[in-house]
Swiss-Prot record:
Annotated PANTHER family: ADP,ATP CARRIER PROTEIN 1 (PTHR31187:SF1), PTHR31187
Keywords tagged on the record: ATP-binding, Cell membrane, Membrane, Nucleotide-binding, Transmembrane, Transmembrane helix, Transport
Family designation: Belongs to the ADP/ATP translocase tlc family.
Gene, per the UniProt record: tlcB
CC terms in the record's Gene Ontology section: plasma membrane
Keyword match Transmembrane helix: yes
The keyword Ion transport is assigned to this record: no
The protein's name: ADP,ATP carrier protein 2
Function per UniProt: Provides the rickettsial cell with host ATP in exchange for rickettsial ADP. This is an obligate exchange system. This energy acquiring activity is an important component of rickettsial parasitism.
Pfam families (UniProt xref): TLC
Amino acid sequence: MNIVDSNCTIWHKARNSKFRHIVWPIRSYELTKFIPMALLMFFILLNQNLVRSLKDSFVVTLISSEVLSFIKLWGEMPMGVLFVILYSKLCNIMTTEQVFRIITGTFLFFFTIFGFILFPYKEFFHPDPELINQYITVLPHLKWFLIIWGQWSLVLFYIMGELWPVIVFTLLYWQLANKITKVEEAPRFYSFFTLFGQTNLLFSGTVIIYFAKSEHFLLPLFAHLNDTNEILLKSFITVILLSGLICLALHKLIDKSVVEADKNIKFKNQRTDILKLSLIESAKIILTSRYLGFICLLVMSYSMSINLIEGLWMSKVKQLYPATKDFISYHGEVLFWTGVLTLVSAFLGSSLIRIYGWFWGAIITPIMMFVAGVIFFSFTIFENHLGNIVNTLGYSSPLVIIVFIGGLWHVFSKSVKYSLFDATKEMVYIPLDNEIKTKGKAAVDVIGAKIGKSIGAVIQFISFSIFPNAVHNDIAGLLMFTFIIVCILWIYGVKVLSQYNNKMIQN
């Protein structure tokens, strides 16, 4: 055997080794599908992280954390329901690829309008603050609704920012992934989609910290502005628009190179994969499906558990970092470390799902969130009794420790969500037929997520409406009790759904 044949044999053995399939299970001929989808996830999630940091920082520092529950209940939930109706109507008259581009373009258009028109001229578009204060004096129990009215453009930006991950990523992106990914490819593809997509957490965290500083490369474009918040917003929106345009270009590439290559049959200038069932017919299928019901339980549980902690955590962060620039810089640091842990979790998660199965990949998220959440609530509730611990650790106040623990909770919960929860949730859709994958998925992912947030928001809404001067600290015990119940139901849902999923795969 000559040297060339020997090298070829070694290369062949390396490519087909067990180690190679564990570390990199993607085959060469699959890269034309895998790479564009991974890049598309990267830029969609880049926008998601930038918008999330903006909306949280601006709303919490310029309004308050207590208003979040009112926005989630009375803003996000109705908008989510309206979207499902609109989405189903659009799916009946055009292809899902066209729907992706229309909806993504609408989001980018709104972000542009908000960043360059609504926020810079908010004094013109918003009602007089003195008028709002007068109404609050007369109607104290409607205080937070009046505050929302007084800052309506900022609230609308928050709602659109919340809908981006649910609609563009969870629904539209994963719908495309489910459409072009085969059942045997899913265990290998999905965790690595997440791995490559979530590397943007490191990038976006760095970008956020960079633009939160006084000097950055876009500053000359806005040198004439005096408002630091306006400069910050316009800089971020510029990056978001560029990233959004890249998303549209990548989606067009995937549509032409993958979707059309697999399905190019046309009849009367219409794609044969356009859905024709009505929303009512779709709802009947969803309501009679226990399988979809348990998927919805998982989505609701995650959304609700996040909602129960998030407001309290942000209220603590605001106490420590009251300035918008400092708040968003802290958010960037949390995102960066979330990215680090996500990369580690993605490598481990891919092997975990392939070796031990769907159940163990899905059960880690609720268990980790439960443990970290209970620790955070406990430290918050007993904040006034942490003096000795604070002095021992050398910190200036218990608030520093609580914010640190809250940051750890966020890092752990988001990293396992990105690396395991999203992938395992999408895997259970694959055995379903096309109708359930599209309209059924829309109802579960959009309405399910919003109902989960709304249930958590109802508790806070009622508390803050009855006691207008209350803050998150005052209801921490109630939030902790509800959080524990939700996590227990979540774990039960994973167990039952695992049994259903195994039966469907076997059939």
